[in-house]
Amino acid sequence: MALPLLEYKPT
């Protein structure tokens, strides 16, 4: 499963 972790990361 490839989840967009970079998008979920709080910048």
From Swiss-Prot:
Q: Which family does it belong to?
A: Belongs to the phycobilisome linker protein family.
> Where does this chain mainly localize?
membrane
Fill in the subunit field for this protein.
The phycobilisome is a hemidiscoidal structure that is composed of two distinct substructures: a core complex and a number of rods radiating from the core.
Give the encoding gene's name.
cpcG3
Free-text function comment from the UniProt entry: Rod-core linker protein required for attachment of phycocyanin to allophycocyanin in cores of phycobilisomes. Linker polypeptides determine the state of aggregation and the location of the disk-shaped phycobiliprotein units within the phycobilisome and modulate their spectroscopic properties in order to mediate a directed and optimal energy transfer.
GO-annotated biological processes: photosynthesis
Write out the GO cellular component annotations.
phycobilisome; plasma membrane-derived thylakoid membrane
Q: Where located?
A: Cellular thylakoid membrane
Q: How is the protein disposed in the membrane? A: Peripheral membrane protein
> What keywords were assigned to this record?
Antenna complex, Membrane, Photosynthesis, Phycobilisome, Thylakoid
- What is the protein name stated in its UniProt record? Phycobilisome rod-core linker polypeptide CpcG3
